[in-house]
Amino acid sequence: MGKKKSLLKTSLFTVGLLEVVNRIIDSASIANTNTKTGGSYYHWKHGDIYYRTFGEKDYPPMLLIHDLTVWSSEYEWLKMAKVLSDTYRIYCVDLIGCGKSDKPGITYTNYFYVQMITDFVKEVIKAPTLVAATGLSGSFVLMANALDETLFTEIMLVSPESLTTLKKSPDEYSKLWLKLFEIPVIGRSVYYFSVLPAFPFRV
């Protein structure tokens, strides 16, 4: 009985400590977002989407989409965007759940991002656009194009995921991880630790 009480106290203390750390990081990240925008927000139905533009408005549009990892953002494209802005009107976007865009507490799916990209092109760019996407985001672009061929004039994929990876379906093990990550204290802690450069576990 004594061991159980000790284990319970230790568990509660650990959870409480994680929550304190999470709140400190939350405050710092909110302050950073509020003071270092330098871009615009598209008020989408599922959350605000941060993006930056480069180049003249009358140049042909080009949409640059970053990879989908916990540390990804439009910053990945910054140097290239400045070079391309000599001939294109560049749109660098933070996908929902990444960078300075909103991070709603939902299960993110491929089709969710397909909808986001489709609406962004139609409501922000407002013209068929050349698009370049890295990693997993290439699959969102291809699906969006399959559903609406008027969105893009050209598609460029940088280091796209293999078809072997893309065809995988969630198994019971991954569903169990999802349930664990959906617990707010644990999910946020794993996210914050996984974005640290020296942290060995990537999600």
Report residues per predicted region:
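Alpha/beta-hydrolase fold catalytic core
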Residues: M1-M62, D86-Y88, K126
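Conserved alpha/beta-hydrolase catalytic His-Asp/Glu region
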Residues: L166-K168, G187-V203
